[in-house]
């Protein structure tokens, strides 16, 4: 395990350094501009941004990721968010293992988990060859049978998508009609009008109400008309 762990740390260090240097370049450029603005007058936003940039500059010059910095005030948090630094992004490591280790992982993936834990990052295990085999099966039933034989509830691809969504604080709502069913991504905590805006900006501006069907009810009754007839269609306002 030692050579494997050393190699992973080395690769990780190279990537971290490249991203940190890019962030440092961004921070120094923004500092040069905003320190001048802050010095000219009583520009509160510029002064807040300068404080944020200086905090980031300090940790980046120490070879640390920008995500290691935390800010207490909402103004600082917003300024930090608007910089879109690469090393503030959440990290998910995907450990590719053999089929026998697809469910529980193995010693190698556990070493990756230990290293990732040092920076508060997440790890998930996936067997790429097994995923290829699953993708080659034609029916949903065949895929589920294959997964059950391996002791898995769902494919690694599905788990990866869910993990990434959770890490990015994203969720999905579905629109369904006679011609099309489509999934839409939104940020967790958004209200119905904001979600409507994902479909079209005019829907958010002119939002009045949303007709909502629970996913389980749609599967149970089979159509919007049947759900409506069963009294399971909800009408929600702007605060939903």
Each language-model region and where it sits:
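Conserved phosphoryl-transfer catalytic core
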Residues: 24-32
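A charged helix-plus-loop insertion that forms the helical arch/lid used to bind
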Residues: 9-11
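C-terminal-of-GTPase-core extension/linker across diverse P-loop GTPases
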Residues: 33-240
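Short, small-residue-biased leader/transition segments that mark boundaries at the very start
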Residues: 2-7
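Short, charge/polar-rich alpha-helical segments
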Residues: 13-19
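Amphipathic alpha-helix face/heptad-repeat signature
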Residues: 20-23, 49
